[in-house]
Amino acid sequence: MKLIIEENADKVAEFAARYVVTKINEATENGKYLVLGLPTGSTPLGMYKKLIEFYNAGVISFEKVKTFNMDEYVDLPRDHTESYHSFMFDNFFRHIDINPANIHILDGNTSDHEKECEEYERKIKESGGIDLFVGGIGPDGHIAFNEPGSSLASRTRIKTLNEDTIQANARFFGGDITKVPTQALTVGVQTVMDAREVMILITGSHKALALHQAIECGISHMCTVSAMQMHRCATFIADEDATLELKVKTVKYFKGLMNHHRSLVMF
């Protein structure tokens, strides 16, 4: 496991975007597609903006990229401004040269949620598995919609959202919790664990306790991202504020490796 510590959220976004570009170019040079798992929410927005900048500068093409998003609300119209389908197209897909046929987002409006989730897992497998799964975490350490108490062996399924998550997401619905969907389709913890690499973005002091629990405490279903401790190639990228709850020696150790880590994303 690696922990990358950057000064602020902008530098977290820069490092993450450069890493994604590096992986895409490596795959393309070998005549392969790169399969990406992608998140929504406020944390990855900076990364998407940087990736668009790299695309506009001619540094990267997304023609050889396939994507699978982490989650989608149930019974929220696809064209709703707060659907994750709208989020991804408004903030990323519409601005790059990705083939729409290579974009995969769960359909929360299907009449058969179980079948949709099974098909999603099948499509991931047919694509050769996810090469790099990018994710964010909630203040309670949840990844995707795998909230506290979720099975660490879980796969894509329908989840009922807890009150904390609904309240946290109310800001996207004008502060009205009655407008927030109460269920979502989400990849499972094991779905993420199956990826060849996982990259978790954490910014802000409100995520500091979650980062501490994720990397300095034991693995627990009450902090689902802690399962990444068992992943063969997991990287956490955090800003200084997100490290406030970490031990001094933990921060010192990983900062001592930063020159090496930065050399991996130089282009």
From Swiss-Prot:
Pfam families: Glucosamine_iso. GO terms for biological process: carbohydrate metabolic process; glucosamine catabolic process; N-acetylglucosamine catabolic process; N-acetylneuraminate catabolic process. Pathway: Nucleotide-sugar biosynthesis; UDP-N-acetyl-alpha-D-glucosamine biosynthesis; alpha-D-glucosamine 6-phosphate from D-fructose 6-phosphate: step 1/1. It is an enzyme of class 3 (hydrolase). GO terms for cellular component: cytoplasm. Signal peptide: none annotated. It comes from the Eukaryota. Its EC number is 3.5.99.6. The keyword Cytoplasm applies. Keywords: Carbohydrate metabolism, Cytoplasm, Hydrolase. GO terms for molecular function: glucosamine-6-phosphate deaminase activity; identical protein binding. It is found in: Cytoplasm. HAMAP family: GlcN6P_deamin. Catalyzes the reversible conversion of alpha-D-glucosamine 6-phosphate (GlcN-6P) into beta-D-fructose 6-phosphate (Fru-6P) and ammonium ion, a regulatory reaction step in de novo uridine diphosphate-N-acetyl-alpha-D-glucosamine (UDP-GlcNAc) biosynthesis via hexosamine pathway. This is Glucosamine-6-phosphate deaminase. It comes from Caenorhabditis elegans. The lineage of its organism: Eukaryota, Metazoa, Ecdysozoa, Nematoda, Chromadorea.
